């Protein structure tokens, strides 16, 4: 809306379950949007991805297949599909270029989710080839922001960390426990920057259908923990305990965002600003 778009079509899951193809196609034919931003997906952290692999591959395949094919059936030529940096091999050269796609073995903990996303990318590319559509695939790095998933077992690293910090703030507890040994390096980006990228690339003519979206900067998990504690609880002395019995996941994952920059897009929000905005929204939601 801030960008001047007023005719925005959204629908709640209880009113339209994206698993059901006939209903999705009927909805798209009725509404006839000029463009689609496909961000709907089943997502979660390491624990959830390891335990519910069938759910992750089935639900994500169904959601994206129904919307991408539905867009074609409804003659909607423009679509942005949001993938994930987990589509890239577990052990590949860093920073990760788009050309590394399908060049090696995936991270085992979330391979079901990754394979579903890979299928979505190939589907967009195939429809572009056969039907001359304009379906673009943006691969965001680890995203966080307001209205994130803070579930105890299936949240991603950043919302899980913010939830733990909030619990400490409300108690006399001065210990925070973190999965793994804190050594993996991760890149993070604010959700509003992802939204900005979606609008930018929807309006931008590109030769590429697969584009990385990130900051190009990464830090160790332990560095994020220390930084967030300093930002949000500057007067508290918190002991950080790492649970080495839990998996680390991929050792390092930072995206090469030179292609996005070449087209004229860069992330704008600092980590500090993003953390404050996200944490304030989470605290407000808990009242």
Language model features with spans:
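Conserved catalytic Lys-bearing alpha helix of Rossmann-like short-chain dehydrogenase/reductases
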Residues: 61-67, 116-124, 158
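C-terminal substrate-binding subdomain of Rossmann-fold SDR/epimerase-dehydratase oxidoreductases
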Residues: 2, 167-287
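Rossmann-fold cofactor-recognition segment
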Residues: 9-22
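Active-site helix of classical SDR
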Residues: 102, 112, 116-119
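Conserved beta-loop-beta element that borders a ligand/cofactor-binding pocket
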Residues: 83-84, 121-149, 159, 170-177
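NAD(P)H-binding glycine-rich loop region in Rossmannoid oxidoreductase-like domains
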Residues: 21-61, 73
């Amino acid at each position: 809306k801030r960008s001047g778009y007023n005719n925005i079509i959204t629908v709640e899951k209880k009113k339209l379950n994206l698993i059901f193809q006939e209903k999705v196609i009927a909805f798209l034919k009725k509404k006839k949007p000029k463009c689609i931003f496909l961000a709907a997906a089943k997502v979660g952290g390491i624990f959830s991805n390891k335990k519910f692999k069938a759910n992750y591959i089935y639900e994500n395949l169904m959601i994206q297949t129904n919307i991408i094919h539905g867009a074609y059936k409804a003659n909607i030529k423009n679509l942005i599909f949001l993938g994930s940096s987990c589509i890239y091999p577990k052990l590949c050269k860093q920073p990760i270029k788009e050309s590394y796609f399908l060049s090696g073995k995936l991270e085992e903990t979330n391979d079901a989710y990754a394979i579903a996303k890979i299928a979505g990318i190939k589907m967009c590319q195939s429809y572009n080839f056969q039907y001359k559509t304009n379906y673009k695939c943006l691969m965001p790095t680890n995203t966080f922001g307001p209205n994130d998933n803070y579930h105890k077992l299936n949240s991603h690293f950043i919302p899980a960390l913010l939830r733990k910090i909030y619990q400490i703030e409300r108690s006399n507890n001065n210990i925070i426990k973190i999965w793994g040994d804190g050594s993996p390096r991760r890149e993070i980006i604010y959700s509003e920057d992802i939204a900005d990228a979606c609008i930018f690339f929807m309006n931008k003519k590109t030769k590429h259908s697969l584009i990385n979206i990130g900051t190009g900067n990464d830090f160790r998990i332990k560095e994020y923990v220390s930084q967030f504690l300093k930002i949000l609880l500057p007067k508290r002395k918190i002991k950080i305990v790492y649970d080495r019995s839990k998996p680390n996941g991929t050792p390092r994952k930072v995206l090469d965002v030179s292609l996005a920059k070449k087209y004229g897009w860069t992330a704008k929000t600092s980590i500090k600003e993003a953390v404050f905005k996200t944490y304030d929204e989470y605290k407000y939601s808990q009242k």
